[in-house]
Amino acid sequence: MAKIQARTQNEGPEDGLREKMIAINRVTKVVKGGRILGFAALTVVGDGDGRVGMGKGKSKEVPAAVQKAMEEARRNLAKISIKNGTLHHRVTGHWGAASVVMIPAPKGTGIIAGGPMRAVFEVMGITDIVAKSHGSSNPYNMVRATLDGLKNSTTASEVAAKRGLTVEEIFA
């Protein structure tokens, strides 16, 4: 409880990371004596320069669930390569029944993406992208599919290194 109070007294996160809440669900556990109510929170955290992480937390109270989710998201940060506020190439991500297609866009396009995908792009610093989700609209599955696709993206220099060529030879 002291951690929650200390966090609410500060104006923002002290580590400079952007935080976004995606979903809070009320969950119940049925036991012999009745129902036990709880809350599950889904959050994303990013530094605005390509690092992004997702976390989920469960607790009997909303603030504690959110705090747990934020801490998990901070522990799970992954670095994604960004070029001029967008991706290097078109990528597809899958998780469960969710499928996400992300297409790089020219400067000035903005973030054209729905719900949970938009939050992921905002915290990681992508400013121009077009994204479409297919299949499951479950926020957890959509975020995991988005992160799966982002982790599968590569730069031209990474492809060149794998092939043993230079970047100029790849584009020639």
Curated annotation (Swiss-Prot):
Gene3D superfamilies from the UniProt entry: 3.30.160.20, 3.30.230.10
Pfam families: Ribosomal_S5, Ribosomal_S5_C
Name of the protein in its database record: Small ribosomal subunit protein uS5
UniProt note: domains: The N-terminal domain interacts with the head of the 30S subunit; the C-terminal domain interacts with the body and contacts protein S4. The interaction surface between S4 and S5 is involved in control of translational fidelity.
Function: With S4 and S12 plays an important role in translational accuracy. Located at the back of the 30S subunit body where it stabilizes the conformation of the head with respect to the body.
SUPFAM superfamilies: dsRNA-binding domain-like, Ribosomal protein S5 domain 2-like
Gene Ontology cellular component terms for the protein in this record: small ribosomal subunit
Record key words, sorted: Ribonucleoprotein, Ribosomal protein, RNA-binding, rRNA-binding
GO molecular function: rRNA binding; structural constituent of ribosome
Assembly, per entry: Part of the 30S ribosomal subunit. Contacts proteins S4 and S8.
Ranges of residues in domain S5 DRBM: 17-80
Family per similarity comment: Belongs to the universal ribosomal protein uS5 family.
Gene Ontology terms: biological process: translation
InterPro entries: Ribosomal_Su5_D2-typ_SF, Ribosomal_uS5, Ribosomal_uS5_bac-type, Ribosomal_uS5_C, Ribosomal_uS5_N, Ribosomal_uS5_N_CS, Ribsml_uS5_D2-typ_fold_subgr
Gene: rpsE
Species whose genome carries this gene: Variovorax paradoxus (strain S110)
